[in-house]
Regions:
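Short, positively charged and aromatic/hydrophobic N-terminal segments
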Residues: 3-14
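Glycine-rich, flexible loop/turn motifs
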Residues: 18-21, 27-30, 57, 61, ...
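Intrinsically disordered, low-complexity boundary segments flanking structured domains
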Residues: 12, 74, 213-216
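Structured loops at beta-to-helix junctions and adjacent beta-edge loops in soluble globular domains
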Residues: 11, 88-90, 190
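N-terminal amphipathic, basic-rich helices that act as targeting or association modules
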Residues: 18-98, 231-239
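Glycine-rich ThDP/TPP pyrophosphate-binding loop and its adjacent helix/strand module
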Residues: 127-243
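Cofactor-binding active-site loop characterized by glycine-rich and histidine/acidic residues
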Residues: 42, 60-181
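Gly-rich Lys/Arg/Thr-decorated short loops/hinges at beta-loop-alpha junctions or inter-strand turns
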Residues: 20-27, 49-53, 116-128, 215-224
């Protein structure tokens, strides 16, 4: 407090509290009721929710915090769980889990009988495949797309694969198989340049060149329709790429 003309004056600082968006979201259907203009606020709330939980629970912060906007955009734009979504590695899935009905149990993350640290098909229909470490997503989403085509289904198929995962033999085998088909599959490379160990090798250098404007893409050389590098924290760029 301060004294003015001999009288104590108390200053009370009030922070304007915005109505919580996350409190009202327990499914992608709830998410779609939010306007696009409100999505940045929801991103902030999701980050705070995850940080608050993991300040007292074990878990992996970096991978999930890096895909907050992507997680929101995927469930906002696509029709999950009918549209199949695979996260590889599974550490990226925290926001996905919170948005798909597991928010109220998220405090039990990685505890006995609690929320799994990775996607789990036994846990939720939104977890299309049980991914852990790592590199299985491309092959899995390919065979799911083949199976759905044989059944006459027209749903979408999306795999989000990390920077360190896509350089593995299994992921490259999956890309080699997928490009030989005409399946409607979307592969999203989360190139955050982060792995357990420092990234090394030819693909590391190639991804760096792509980020700096190189037009010679390994993915186009494979035969994929390659959208290019986008800002994964920009809803405008994400929705444009999905279109």
């Amino acid at each position: 407090f301060a004294k003015i003309v001999g009288f104590p004056v108390f200053y009370v600082i009030l922070r304007l509290q915005m109505e919580s968006l996350l409190d009202n979201i327990n499914s992608p259907q709830d998410l779609k009721k939010v306007t696009v203009a409100q999505l940045p606020q929801l991103s902030m709330e999701l980050r705070e929710f995850i940080l608050d939980t993991l300040s007292v629970k074990p878990g992996h912060l970096g991978a999930s915090l890096g895909v907050i906007e992507l997680s929101i955009a995927l469930h906002y734009f696509f029709n999950t769980p009918e549209d199949l979504l695979i996260w590889d590695v599974g550490h990226q899935c925290y926001a996905h889990k919170i948005l798909t009905g597991r928010k109220n149990n998220f405090h039990s993350l990685r505890q006995l009988n609690g929320i799994a640290g990775f996607p789990s098909r036994e846990e939720s229909e939104f977890d299309a495949f049980g991914t852990g470490h790592s590199s299985t997503s491309v092959s899995a989403i390919t065979v799911m797309a083949i199976a759905n085509r044989l059944q006459g289904k027209t749903n979408k198929h999306i795999a989000v694969i990390g920077y360190a995962s896509i350089v593995s033999g299994m992921a490259l085998e999956g890309l080699n198989h997928l490009v030989s088909t005409d399946l409607d599959v979307l592969i999203i490379l989360n190139d955050n340049s982060i792995g357990i160990d420092p990234s090394v090798g030819a693909l590391k250098e190639h991804f760096f060149e792509l980020e700096n404007g190189s037009k010679n893409s390994i993915f186009e050389n494979f035969g994929f329709h390659y959208k290019g590098v986008i800002d994964g924290h920009s809803f405008d760029e994400l929705f444009s790429a999905f279109e």
